[in-house]
Design a protein with these regions (language model features):
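Extracellular glycan-recognition regions
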Residues: 1-188
Length: 188
């Protein structure tokens, strides 16, 4: 839900280059590109703690209010590998502690957490965070409202970072994920 009270803290539409606030975890230059106002990353094998081409930026100071982190995720190629996924990951003191992703599980696509069915190629993810909690919401392609997937707790803030990433791709596969219109908003 967008309102006039929301303030953009950081945004990147990936048009013409990456903003200086970004940095890479385990960058593999040949497997990411900027194209037509989007960031495209090839889904490579790996796990949360070994993910390649994870684009990371400083997270907002959760003690200063409620924030929403948003990005649109589009599958160029439908996932085929069990647990193949793309979306937002929250890091706390250098460790991945939470993810909101579009993920293939047993042949079907879901929004995780919450295991909400996700049949569309494109989805807008919106992770809302406070000093101690998160709410994972999503807006499927063609819909106007965000739906709540799940809620939970976050550890106390400690060098928090936000990442957009994809992993668990097939060996030798050419599965590309497109990220568009990343933003962090202060919503209260």
């Amino acid at each position: 839900m967008s309102s006039s009270l929301e303030t953009i803290v950081f945004s990147d539409n990936f048009d013409g280059g990456l903003d200086d606030n970004w940095s890479w975890l385990r960058e593999d230059e040949k497997n990411w590109r900027l194209a037509d106002g989007g960031l495209e990353i090839m889904v490579e094998p790996g796990l949360a703690d070994t993910v390649k081409n994870a684009l990371v930026c400083p997270a907002p100071d959760r003690s200063q209010g409620t924030f929403a982190i948003e990005v649109t995720v589009y599958n160029h190629t439908l996932p085929t590998q069990q647990y193949e996924q793309a979306g937002i990951t929250w890091y706390n003191d250098g460790k991945p502690v939470f993810k909101e992703v579009k993920e293939l599980i047993d042949g079907d696509l879901y929004i995780i957490p919450g295991k909400q069915p996700m049949p569309t190629k494109s989805v807008r993810l919106r992770l809302i965070v406070t000093a101690n909690s998160w709410e994972a919401t999503y807006q499927p392609e063609g819909e106007s409202e965000f739906k709540v997937a799940a809620t939970g707790e976050l550890p106390p803030p400690q060098n928090d970072q936000v990442s957009i990433q994809c992993y668990h791709g097939p060996e030798g596969g050419e599965h590309w994920i497109r990220f568009e219109d990343f933003c962090i908003k202060k919503i209260s």
